[in-house]
């Protein structure tokens, strides 16, 4: 696998409303754990659409991993000005990402036109990647359901690796056990 797509929940679906929410560090650690494994096996690119939440957090992880691995980050939003209605803090983060990513190109020119742009974006990212890392709870799929349904219908031999709530709990426990005060 050379190209991995990463996607998952938007922050609101996880009841995360601030960038300093402590749960983000656990999600990032879970993403890092999986991406690091793929990098050890030869992963070269991580691609995302740049939506807020899991995808922006994955971008942060990839940018940090660039210090250790020759990984590249591609950002392919469904349309220009994807961040038009986002909170200012997330807009700034997204703008910075568009400048620091190794490759950035919206799939459609112009602003939002209709839901077909999201479906096209999903299919394009699936077509351009070798596998997907998806943060999703099958009991509460939220907006990831649309992407997951697309995968089920169209990408039969496409590997999907998931990060589940249990995976995040395991990472939380690992991080707690690394804290020297945990053992006091």
From Swiss-Prot:
Coiled coil: none annotated. It comes from the Bacteria. InterPro entries: YspA. Disulfide bonds: none annotated. It holds the Pfam family YpsA. Belongs to the UPF0398 family. NCBIfam families: PRK13660.1. This is UPF0398 protein OB1025. It comes from Oceanobacillus iheyensis (strain DSM 14371 / CIP 107618 / JCM 11309 / KCTC 3954 / HTE831).
